[in-house]
Amino acid sequence: MAKKSMIAKNKRPAKYSTQAYTRCEKCGRPHSVYRKFKLCRVCFRELAYKGQIPGVVKASW
């Protein structure tokens, strides 16, 4: 879990466009964030297993 100060800092607009970085909307994790869903891989997997992300199904072949 990210510190509250880091989450608040991320919500502010960056001074320069290169300073902006993605953070998970649910837990605030800065690494391995899927831009399309704005979730980290851990949160994405949890929500996908629960069926809370529409259109996402477990792959089987």
Swiss-Prot record:
Subunit: Part of the 30S ribosomal subunit. Contacts proteins S3 and S10.
Source organism, top-level taxon: Bacteria
PROSITE patterns in the record: RIBOSOMAL_S14
Cofactor binding note from Swiss-Prot or TrEMBL: Binds 1 zinc ion per subunit.
Binding site for Zn(2+): 24, 27, 40, 43
Protein name (record): Small ribosomal subunit protein uS14B
UniProt source species: Streptococcus equi subsp. zooepidemicus (strain MGCS10565)
GO-annotated molecular function: rRNA binding; structural constituent of ribosome; zinc ion binding
GO biological process: translation
Gene3D superfamilies: 30s Ribosomal Protein S14, Chain N
Coiled coil: none
Family from the record: Belongs to the universal ribosomal protein uS14 family. Zinc-binding uS14 subfamily.
Role this protein plays: Binds 16S rRNA, required for the assembly of 30S particles and may also be responsible for determining the conformation of the 16S rRNA at the A site.
GO cellular component terms listed in the entry, alphabetical order: small ribosomal subunit
UniProt KW keywords: Metal-binding, Ribonucleoprotein, Ribosomal protein, RNA-binding, rRNA-binding, Zinc
Keyword rRNA-binding assigned: yes
Cofactor: Zn(2+)
